[in-house]
Design a protein with these regions (language model features):
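Positively charged n-region of N-terminal signal peptides that target proteins for export
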Residues: 1-7
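Bacterial N-terminal signal peptides
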Residues: 7-19
Length: 300
């Protein structure tokens, strides 16, 4: 299919969904350590800000810290089930840690949320277009339970055995606010476009760090599994606001600085076993403060 046809189909998909509502639910789960808690919460906050900028009329719910409980998630999805119509769309973003021991679980304060339970909650929502973006460790382990017709699945890892902390979330969130992710220039970032953006950035991260990649993201839109196709390409995750889509040089500098600090934190954690505990804590604290400062500037 040539690029002009792909762009036409993309524009048609956006046009068809103008009068439908999109329900966004972003959850930053349990970090386990202060640095993860802070970074997960920052990513959730950044996502919320981007969504409110580009989709002010959408239904947006964000859970982080002590509010990211299984009970609150169940209640939020219950509200969506009561309000959504078949033509609507649902976008679920999971940020944090996951585990897989025969079944996948998303780590939360209090009881965890299993992939099977999440699937059951989503199955009650009448919206026929659904996207689940699971950026946690071991996230691929939940795909089998979550598969359903018209549901797009994106996971940071291919299987449940990839259990290390992931960086995919950072680049997925970045894709939502970066006009360059809209490769067909139709005014929206599709699930496929955001996935390819984040996948490419994740691969580059490990190459630049000269580290073996411990995460291999996948996207699928068939109940039988396998590679994604037209459904993912024509699912607009976010329509870009024309007034704010133009690149801001000052923001680009801050985003580059944030990425640099994030990378320094990752490098420090990678070298943790080689450092004295007090030195590690001091350096980590310094970097986390810098990350918070940069994010505060970005949020202005």
């Amino acid at each position: 299919m040539n690029r002009s046809l792909m762009r036409l189909f993309g524009l048609m998909a956006v046009a068809l969904t103008v009068h439908a509502n999109t329900f966004y639910v972003t959850i930053a789960g349990l970090g386990g350590e202060p640095d993860y808690e802070q970074r997960f919460a920052l990513l959730a906050s950044e996502t919320e800000k981007t969504l409110k900028t580009h989709a002010p009329d959408a239904s947006i719910e964000t859970f982080k810290g002590p509010d990211a409980t299984r009970a609150n998630i169940r209640a939020a999805l219950g509200r969506i089930a009561a309000a959504a119509k078949p033509q609507d769309a649902v976008v679920i973003l999971l940020i944090g840690h996951g585990t897989f021991e025969g079944d996948y679980k998303f780590n939360l304060p209090g009881p965890d949320l299993s992939a099977q339970e999440l699937a059951e909650l989503l199955n009650k929502i009448p919206a026929t277009r659904q996207l689940v973006v699971n950026t946690t460790s071991a996230s691929g382990g939940g795909n089998e339970a979550l598969r359903k017709a018209n549901r797009i699945l994106i996971s940071a890892t291919k299987t449940g055995s990839e259990k290390n902390a992931t960086v995919f979330a950072r680049f997925w969130v970045e894709a939502l606010g970066d006009p360059s992710a809209d490769t067909d220039k139709n005014g929206s970032v599709s699930a496929m476009e955001a996935f390819r953006f984040a996948e490419r950035k994740t691969k580059s991260f490990y190459e630049e760090q000269k580290r073996l990649s411990t995460e291999h993201a996948v996207i699928e839109d068939s109940p039988k599994g396998g590679a994604a196709g037209q459904l993912a390409m024509n699912f607009p995750v976010l329509r870009l606001n024309a007034e704010t889509a133009a690149a801001d040089p000052a923001k680009r500098v801050l985003q580059a600085k944030r990425d640099q600090v994030e990378t320094q934190i990752d490098q420090l954690k990678y070298q943790k076993s080689l450092l004295a505990p007090e030195l590690y804590r001091t350096q980590l604290s310094k970097l986390l403060l810098e990350l918070a400062r940069v994010q505060e500037e970005l949020d202005k």
